[in-house]
C-alpha cells in the first residue's frame, strides 16, 4: 500500500511541477521530450525527478505483452514499470522507485481498499474528489525533496482513460501558485503532400485540452524538420500562446541529441523564466558541454552485434539497445544491432550469425523461439564468437551446455519443458506456492558475490556487484557440480543462487541471471556490455591480423 503523506502538503514550499501531455497520436515522444527537459534543468543545477502516469487499469506493467507495450522496465525496488521510466533514469541519472509510476490500477485499488476499511466514514466514493485526490497525493509524494518534478501523462488528450488525471492536474494548478506550474503539450506537425507544415491537428488537440480546463504554456511540435517561423506564428495565434513558447522537436538519429536540439530552441531558458527560477551560475554552454561531449564522441571502430530474440518490436528490448549504445560511447565504438528472429532461424542460423561480430541473447518468457536461441548459443560456443546472455539467455546457456557438452540430451528448463528428466533450470523454492502472476517474481536490485580471478571479476573490477533481477526460475542446485565438470563455471553467486556463468575455453562467454541493461547510463555504461564490446573489438583485430598474415604468406 502506498505510504501516507508525512505532513499536510504546503503549496508555499515552492516546488515546481511541469506537466507533459500529448495530442494527435500516441508514440510521439512525450517521454523523451520530458526526459530531455529534465536533463537540461539538471544541467542548470536543479534537483529534478519525474513521474509517469499510465491510465491503464493494470496495477503495473509486469504482466503486459511486450508486443503491445514494449519492454517491462525493472526499478531498483522491484517495480515493473513502463519503459519511459527507463528513459527518465538514463537521462536524469537518477534511480526511480515504484512511487514514480502512477497507474489507474494502483489508484483505484488503494481507494477501494480505503473504502472497505471504512476510511471514508460512509461517504459516497467518487472520481472527484477521492480518485483525483489520490492522484495528486501520489504526484506530491514522488516529488518530495526535489526542486522540479516533471509529470508525463500517458496516452493522448481525449482518451477516456485519461480524464480523471487531467481533472486532477486542473485541480493541481488551482491549488498551486501559478509560477509553480507549467503545462507542456507535445503534438504532431505533419507535412502535406506539397511540403507544407500543417497546424490543424495541433489546433484541434489544444482545443480538446482547453475544453477540459487546461491551457498549455508551452507547445512542442514533433516533426521531421524544425518548425518554420510562419508555422510557429500560426500555432501561437490559434492556440493562444506566445510565439516564443512554440518549440520544435524534430526527428534525430539519436535520442540523446534531443536535449541539445531543444536547448538550441531555447526551451530550457523559457521554462526557467516561466517558473521564475534562476539557474546556478553556470553558462548555457558550460552546463551542456559534458552532455554534448558524451553524445557526440567520435567512434574509432564499428561492430555488428546480433540480438537474438523473439519479439520483433524494437521497444521490447529497448534497454538492451541503449546499453549497447552506452558501451559504444565508452569504447568509442559504432554499434550496429542486427535483429535475428529466434523463431525463424533454425534452418539458417549459421548464415544469420556468420555476419555478426558478437551475439546477445536477451531475456524473455515462454517456449516460442527457444530452439533458435539454443542454436545461437551453440554457434557462439563452437566458433568462439563473443557471447552475452541475459536472464533467459543465461539459463539457455546452461541448457545448451547440459545438452551438447555434458550429453544430457533431454536436459531443459522446467519452465519450458515441465516433464524433462534433467531440469537444470528449476523454479525458485519460494515460488512453489505462488498462485498469482503480477509482482510475484524475484524482482529488483540484489547483490552478487563474484569469485576473484575470473572473467566476471575483471568485468566488474571487483568481487561484488548489485544488479536488477526479474525471474521465477534459477539454476537447479542439484546439477551445479555436474554443470561445472567441464569448462563452464558459475563465477557469481547470491545466497547459493547462481548469478553469473562463464567459459574458460572461450575468449568471451558470459551469462548473467540478472539484467545489467537496467542500470546502464550514457555516462556510466554497464560493465558486462563494455567488456562484451571490448572483446568483440579484440576478436575483430585478431581476425584482421590473421587475414593480413595470410595474405602476406600468399604473396
Swiss-Prot record:
UniProt binding sites for UTP: 26, 198-203, 234
Family annotation (InterPro entries): Class_I_gatase-like, CTP_synthase, CTP_synthase_N, GATASE, GATase1_CTP_Synthase, P-loop_NTPase
Pfam families to which the protein is assigned, alphabetical: CTP_synth_N (PF06418), GATase (PF00117)
Positions annotated to bind L-glutamine: 67, 364, 392-395, 415, 472
UniProt keyword Nucleotide-binding, yes or no: yes
Catalyzed reactions per annotation: UTP + L-glutamine + ATP + H2O = CTP + L-glutamate + ADP + phosphate + 2 H(+); L-glutamine + H2O = L-glutamate + NH4(+); UTP + NH4(+) + ATP = CTP + ADP + phosphate + 2 H(+)
Protein name: CTP synthase
EC numbers for this chain: 6.3.4.2
Record function comment: Catalyzes the ATP-dependent amination of UTP to CTP with either L-glutamine or ammonia as the source of nitrogen. Regulates intracellular CTP levels through interactions with the four ribonucleotide triphosphates.
Activity regulation info: Allosterically activated by GTP, when glutamine is the substrate; GTP has no effect on the reaction when ammonia is the substrate. The allosteric effector GTP functions by stabilizing the protein conformation that binds the tetrahedral intermediate(s) formed during glutamine hydrolysis. Inhibited by the product CTP, via allosteric rather than competitive inhibition.
Keyword Cell division: no
Binding partners and assembly: Homotetramer.
GO molecular function term, any single one: metal ion binding
Note: CTPSs have evolved a hybrid strategy for distinguishing between UTP and CTP. The overlapping regions of the product feedback inhibitory and substrate sites recognize a common feature in both compounds, the triphosphate moiety. To differentiate isosteric substrate and product pyrimidine rings, an additional pocket far from the expected kinase/ligase catalytic site, specifically recognizes the cytosine and ribose portions of the product inhibitor.
Species the sequence originates in: Haloquadratum walsbyi (strain DSM 16790 / HBSQ001)
Domain of life: Archaea
Entries under CDD domains matching the protein: CTPS_N, GATase1_CTP_Synthase
Keywords: ATP-binding, Glutamine amidotransferase, Ligase, Magnesium, Metal-binding, Nucleotide-binding, Pyrimidine biosynthesis
Pathways involved: Pyrimidine metabolism; CTP biosynthesis via de novo pathway; CTP from UDP: step 2/2
Gene Ontology terms: biological process: 'de novo' CTP biosynthetic process; pyrimidine nucleobase biosynthetic process
Region (Amidoligase domain): 1-277
Binding site for CTP: 26, 159-161, 198-203, 234
Active-site residues annotated for this sequence: 391 (nucleophile), 515, 517
